[in-house]
């Protein structure tokens, strides 16, 4: 399947399942959207890689996606990939590339206390891009920054298919430091967390607003690349890496859950 050629209007890239809610949200707005989702399991998680590693790997994946699928627009549905590689990848291809970056501007606009929590990967938290967002939009704000690699791994391994009590327990552990700090806005700055956004909001309660970048990214993607009638209906999910039966079964289930065709493995 690695040399399979198909054409899709929209391409979504992530290291794992994080970008699936973004792809799904676009298809909710445009049910017949032609879309390919590529999970780069070879390099999961991006959040503990160096900037140079992420740039090199994202470049290779994007080149493969361009060659095999000829998308009209690419969405980097991963904060770690976006803060590290967005500008580099935009210079690499002729089609628009939309990034997913921490929704700090939105968080500042929502915050009354100017005390904001950011939950992300380690490399997103420490990257200068995130520091620039804080400086540009968050003057006078106090930021509580926290990485949670454990929750990301749990979500990647299928937490969303477990009973809700188990999901809620994992999310409650993750938000406890933010509750203790008294933040009034929490930014979900890793796309994996968006899978359980409703539980984040339930756990922090009405005194805190949970924000993410999903709606803004989908709006921007459709504004830059309106759907075309000649490319309709085909929506597929690919995964990079060794042809592992457990991974295949897990991603086939994810694909079905989000209304995509499980298309198999992509060699990158």
Curated annotation (Swiss-Prot):
Pathway: Cell wall biogenesis; peptidoglycan biosynthesis. The active site is at 78 (proton donor/acceptor), 190 (proton donor/acceptor). It comes from the Bacteria. InterPro entries: Asp/Glu/hydantoin_racemase, Asp/Glu_race, Asp/Glu_racemase_AS_1, Glu_race. The keyword Nucleus does not apply. Provides the (R)-glutamate required for cell wall biosynthesis. Belongs to the aspartate/glutamate racemases family. Its EC number is 5.1.1.3. It is an enzyme of class 5 (isomerase). It catalyses: L-glutamate = D-glutamate. Substrate binds at residues 14-15, 46-47, 79-80, 191-192. The keyword Nucleotide-binding does not apply. This is Glutamate racemase. The gene is murI. It holds the Pfam family Asp_Glu_race. One of its GO terms (biological process) is cell wall organization. Keywords: Cell shape, Cell wall biogenesis/degradation, Isomerase, Peptidoglycan synthesis. GO terms for molecular function: glutamate racemase activity.
